[in-house]
């Protein structure tokens, strides 16, 4: 009987059979993977890409309609140029979302309404100082704009005076009033050269009316400022008479504090006081008639009460504003805000009517009055002026109004609102993704220090060409984004630069060397404001990239409601509820500027820069390249030795398997039962 072969041929051949059985499964998996790749490549093609809508004529018509609506709202005449500018405003870039900071914008190209509560004096120059007093108008520069639409806000009731019979809400009505004063006749035979007779001067002047429901005589006990003394104490009879019968009376800067006339604005709270009436409650006509012979048979006006007759001269009607107190009984302790020269502006709205002593006819005197920089006059029809109080703020709007700096009798049918160019505003601007810095040199050092770190430089080399391309691409994208996001701050900077240069050139042309004292005073006042702006600029740390505005280090909270900023730009300065308290913002900016000065360590920055430059020395890089070379050599050696070690390990495992087979045969046969020649060699598995 032939002997069976040693071992188990079925079991030993299972290793090969199992491998053959697994191949169909691997092929199926590979096939499925190929199908999935094809499907994945088809999915992007199946995505529907929206077709970009082409610009059609209907779109252009819609844009033109929006631009025409902008011109209509702003009351701007429609021309090809204005329509093009309106289209640019409609097609303006979207708002940017970079870093926002508060910017200090000196002398901005905007106008704010002036309230009666403003303590800044409004200076008025006239061409008839002989009959109106004050300072002469040597300018002769009278400017009038076209129709504009004005919108503003004020903390207090705006200064609004109506020269028409119709009065807008919040405005005061004016009327003709009679001012009388008498001067002595000349008699050289008498002591002092004064005769026994008196000469009466009669002047009809437009001022606040003293009749009607909005006028009340209220005794007042409050003391006026020392600048306004009692007329009967400060100016005696004939104190300014110089012996010239043709010289009109002088205007006296005094008051009668024991009597006062109050005027109320139409439909609004607050009072305007006038202490220039010597006898507000008694008509002085009867007293003058009783002394008719003394005044050369002078007869007072008929059907017109006389309350402003004073022997020493004409008393200037200084107006004092009083806010309505919360407690009606606390009126005597409410502060009064004086307005000393506004009466001259009102007087110029109509001709002066003068009756000289000894004349029967009245003389019409045309008059003009101008406000000085930075004030202007907004003229408009009463029905087109709207003053509305919302909460604690007055909203002012005027349609088809004109801006001017002077008034004359042509304004008799209009109402006037005083506006002012503010010395500065705080405007939030966007500077993009770049950091805020006030010194370009220091910022350059910082940039260089960040870029020359040795470890980052070596890491960039190891990354390879693809990584370098990605880094360059990211820098290019960041630069493009930075340029786009800086549009807001750049626009404000360029706008203010253009306005500043234009106004400076115009001012140089207008202000001639032969300007009189008043023009020189205006220049000095404006230079004083420029010095104040420069002082603020020098004490505040500003962004180095913007020269015509000061981008402060105070961040702007972009989540704030823009209406608060808009209210500030329209005229609200000190109201935390609806706007910002500008004084508090200014203090915060000053504190941050001081902290920023202390935070800059120039010595530390220089040392850091020196260390960074030292790290870029090629001799110092040798150690890094040595380490890299040693590491690469070790890696090559390991890769070369690994196949040899793996082959030796496979042979060892093969020998161990052979020894195990021999031991199994010995156990089955009970020793060395089979000769070596008859032993069947078992199939071996190759590990190589």
From Swiss-Prot:
Biased composition (Polar residues): 1-15
Source domain of life: Viruses
Post-translational modification: Specific enzymatic cleavages in vivo yield mature proteins. Envelope glycoproteins are synthesized as an inactive precursor that is N-glycosylated and processed likely by host cell furin or by a furin-like protease in the Golgi to yield the mature SU and TM proteins. The cleavage site between SU and TM requires the minimal sequence [KR]-X-[KR]-R.
Annotated InterPro entries: GP41-like, Retroviral_env_glycoprotein
Residue span of region Fusion peptide: 457-477
Residues with site note (Cleavage): 454-455
Region of interest: Immunosuppression: 463-481
Propeptide cleavage-removed residue intervals: 455-456
PANTHER family with a match to the protein in the record: ENDOGENOUS RETROVIRUS GROUP K MEMBER 113 ENV POLYPROTEIN-RELATED, ENDOGENOUS RETROVIRUS GROUP K MEMBER 21 ENV POLYPROTEIN-LIKE
Listed name of the protein: Envelope glycoprotein gp70
Native species: Mouse mammary tumor virus (strain BR6)
């Amino acid at each position: 009987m032939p002997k069976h072969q040693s071992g188990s041929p079925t079991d030993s051949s299972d290793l090969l059979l199992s491998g053959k059985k697994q191949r169909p499964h691997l092929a199926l998996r590979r096939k499925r993977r190929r199908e999935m790749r094809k499907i994945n490549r088809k999915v992007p093609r199946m995505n529907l890409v929206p077709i970009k809508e082409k610009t059609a004529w209907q779109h252009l018509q819609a844009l033109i309609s929006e631009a025409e609506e902008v011109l209509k709202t702003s009351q701007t005449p429609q021309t090809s140029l204005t329509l093009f500018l309106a289209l640019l405003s409609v097609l303006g870039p979207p708002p940017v979302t970079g870093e926002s900071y508060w910017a200090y914008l000196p002398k901005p190209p905007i106008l704010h309404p002036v309230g009666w509560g403003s303590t800044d004096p409004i200076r008025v120059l006239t061409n008839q100082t002989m009959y109106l007093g004050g300072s002469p108008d040597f300018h002769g520069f009278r400017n009038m704009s076209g129709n504009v639409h004005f919108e503003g806000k004020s903390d207090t009731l705006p200064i609004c005076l109506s020269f028409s019979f119709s009065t807008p809400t919040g405005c005061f009505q004016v009327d003709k009033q009679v001012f009388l004063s008498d001067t002595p006749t000349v008699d050289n035979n008498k002591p002092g050269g004064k005769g026994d007779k008196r000469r009466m001067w009669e002047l009809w002047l437009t001022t606040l009316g003293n009749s009607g429901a909005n006028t009340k005589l209220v005794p007042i006990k409050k003391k006026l400022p020392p600048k306004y003394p009692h007329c009967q104490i400060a100016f005696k009879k004939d104190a300014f008479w110089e012996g010239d019968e043709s010289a009109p009376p002088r205007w006296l800067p005094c008051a009668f504090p024991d009597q006062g006339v109050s005027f109320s604005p139409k439909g609004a709270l607050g009072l305007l006081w006038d202490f220039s009436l010597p006898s507000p409650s008694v008509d002085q006509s009867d007293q003058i008639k009783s002394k008719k012979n003394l005044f050369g048979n002078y007869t007072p006006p008929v059907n017109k009460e006389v309350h402003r007759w004073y022997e020493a001269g004409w008393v200037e009607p200084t107006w004092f504003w009083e806010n309505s107190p919360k407690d009606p009984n606390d009126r005597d302790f409410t502060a009064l805000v004086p307005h000393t020269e506004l009466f001259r502006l009102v007087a110029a709205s109509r001709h002066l009517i003068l009756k000289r002593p000894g004349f029967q006819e009245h003389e019409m005197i045309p008059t003009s009055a101008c406000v000085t920089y930075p004030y202007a006059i907004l003229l408009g029809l009463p029905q087109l002026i709207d003053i509305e109080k919302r909460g604690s703020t007055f909203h002012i709007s005027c349609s088809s109004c004109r801006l001017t700096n002077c008034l004359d009798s042509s304004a008799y049918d209009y109402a006037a609102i005083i506006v002012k160019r503010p010395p500065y505003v705080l405007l939030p601007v966007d500077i993009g993704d770049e950091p805020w810095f006030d010194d370009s040199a220091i910022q350059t050092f910082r940039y260089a220090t960040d870029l020359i770190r040795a470890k980052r430089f070596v890491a960039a080399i190891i990354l390879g060409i693809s990584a370098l391309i990605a880094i360059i691409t990211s820098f290019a994208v960041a630069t493009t984004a930075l340029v786009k996001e800086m549009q807001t701050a750049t626009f404000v900077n360029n706008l203010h630069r253009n306005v500043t240069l234009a106004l400076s050139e115009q001012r140089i042309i207008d202000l001639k060397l032969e300007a009189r004292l008043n023009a020189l005073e205006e220049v000095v006042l404006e230079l004083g404001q420029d010095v104040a702006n420069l002082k603020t600029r020098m004490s505040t740390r500003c962004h180095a990239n913007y020269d015509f505005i000061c981008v402060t280090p105070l961040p702007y909270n972009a989540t704030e409601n823009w209406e608060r900023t808009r209210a500030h730009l329209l005229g609200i300065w000190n109201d935390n509820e609806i706007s910002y308290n500008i004084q508090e913002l200014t203090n915060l900016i000053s504190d941050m500027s001081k902290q920023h000065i202390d935070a800059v360590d120039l010595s530390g920055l220089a040392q850091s820069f020196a260390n960074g430059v030292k790290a870029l020395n090629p001799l110092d890089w040798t150690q890094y390249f040595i380490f890299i070379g040693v590491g690469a050599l070790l890696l090559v050696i390991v890769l070369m030795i690994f196949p040899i070690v793996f082959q030796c390990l496979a042979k060892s495992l093969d020998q161990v398997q052979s020894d195990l087979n021999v031991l199994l045969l010995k156990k089955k046969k009970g020793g060395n039962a089979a000769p070596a020649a008859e032993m069947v060699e078992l199939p071996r598995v190759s590990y190589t």
